[in-house]
Regions:
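Conserved class I S-adenosyl-L-methionine
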Residues: 1-37, 52-56
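C-terminal alpha-helical "lid/dimerization" subdomain adjacent to the S-adenosyl-L-methionine
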Residues: 144-212
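Class I SAM-dependent methyltransferase SAM/SAH-binding core
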Residues: 44-46, 50-98
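A short glycine-rich, Lys/Arg-flanked "PGG" loop and its adjoining helix->strand segment in the class I
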Residues: 125-137
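A generic alpha-to-beta junction signature in SAM-dependent methyltransferases
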Residues: 36-37, 60, 83, 135
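A short SAM/SAH-binding and catalytic strip from SAM-dependent methyltransferases
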Residues: 109-122
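Core SAM-dependent methyltransferase catalytic element
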Residues: 214-244
Length: 244
């Protein structure tokens, strides 16, 4: 989740409105929120964007403190405006692989939606370690994102074929079930996914394995409908007795 992801500053759409037409995205976010522990007091929203997921977390846990982190200044500004009257919610500029501005063991939950596929593959170990660090013992990391079926070098025929087929099917689904604008957004971003330019799909197992390697006690993969679109929620837990 580097500065490359700030291309979202330049996407000329009403992000909340367009994503709101997509039932598959709504289902993914709902599945993520369903994983929130009822007693969570402090929540970190990674790649918080305009605050769509933040809003759902606030509804689910009205007394929790929520901190949103995003690399795109325009997104941070929009989210701050949206939550200007909420003293328990704040936003800051930052990236998943460097949460050095946040203290150790300061959150019960780290949650993310449609954001961490912006990470460069080489930064996954650092991001996983940072997520583990900021969570309290027993804390949970919830990652709702889009994934692919094939790993491999960027530009390899097998990987590119999988990504092209998957995202083309998604575009057709969006046109049929969501909106023309949602389909166009997918098509506009397709070259970035194929070049792995700020939009880099992985298999869910790739993420799970890095979380376990970082020291998470367990990590589960939850499929959401329609399963063929390969949206998944990864739920990883820090051991209750783990060092902070």
């Amino acid at each position: 989740m580097t500065s490359e992801t700030t291309h979202w500053n330049d996407v000329g759409i009403d992000y909340d409105k367009v994503l709101g037409t997509d039932a598959s995205n709504v289902a993914l976010l709902s599945a993520a929120v369903d994983q929130l522990p009822s007693g969570a007091r402090d929540i970190l929203d990674i790649g918080s964007g305009t605050g769509r997921l933040t809003s759902l977390c606030r509804t689910a846990l009205p007394e929790a403190r929520i901190v949103g982190v995003d690399p795109a200044p325009a997104m941070v500004e929009e989210a701050e405006s949206k939550f200007a009257d909420d003293p328990l919610t704040s936003f800051r500029h930052g990236v998943a692989e460097d949460l050095s501005g946040l203290p150790d063991a300061s959150f019960d939950v780290a949650i993310s939606s449609f954001a961490l596929h912006h990470l460069e593959l080489g930064t996954y170990p650092k991001a996983a370690a940072e997520l583990l660090r900021v969570l309290r013992p027993g804390g949970v990391f919830i990652n709702a994102d889009q994934f692919c079926r094939v790993m491999g070098p960027a530009g390899s025929k097998e990987r590119a074929t999988d990504v092209l087929a998957l995202l083309t099917d998604k575009a057709k689904y969006y046109l049929r079930e969501a909106s023309f604008e949602r389909m166009l957004l997918q098509i506009d971003l397709l070259p970035r996914f194929l070049r792995e330019d700020g939009e880099i799909l992985t298999t869910p197992e790739f993420w799970r394995d890095h979380l376990l390697d970082a020291g998470f006690a367990e990590a589960d993969i939850v499929a959401t409908e329609p399963v063929e679109l390969f949206n998944r929620v990864i739920v990883a837990r820090k051991a209750p007795g783990a060092a902070s």
